Amino acid sequence: MNAEFSRTLSLLRQEKGVSQRAAAGALGISQALLSHYENGIREPGLPFVVRACDYYGVSADFLLGRT
C-alpha cells in the first residue's frame, strides 16, 4: 500500500463522522489495527479492503489512490 491509502482511509472515516472504535467495530477489526492502517504502520489484506470499500461506499481504485 502507499501513504495515499492510509490518508484516504482516515479521511473517509472522518467524513462519515465516526470514531475509530465505531468504524473498527463495523469493519470487524480492533481499533488498534484500524489506527495502524490509518497511520501506515500495517498493510491490510484484500478482505479488509473489500469491507472498507463496502462500508464507505467507494471503489477499491479510489481507496487505493488509483483515481
Show the residue positions of the predicted features.
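Alpha-helical residues within the helix-turn-helix
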Residues: 14, 25, 54
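DNA major-groove recognition helix of helix-turn-helix/homeodomain DNA-binding modules
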Residues: 28, 47-62
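DNA major-groove recognition helix of helix-turn-helix
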Residues: 38, 48, 67
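Residues that mark the N-terminal boundary/hinge immediately upstream of a DNA-recognition element
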Residues: 8, 19, 45-48, 59
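Short alpha-helical DNA-recognition segment
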Residues: 17-39
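A short, Lys/Arg-rich alpha-helix, primarily the initiator
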Residues: 1-15
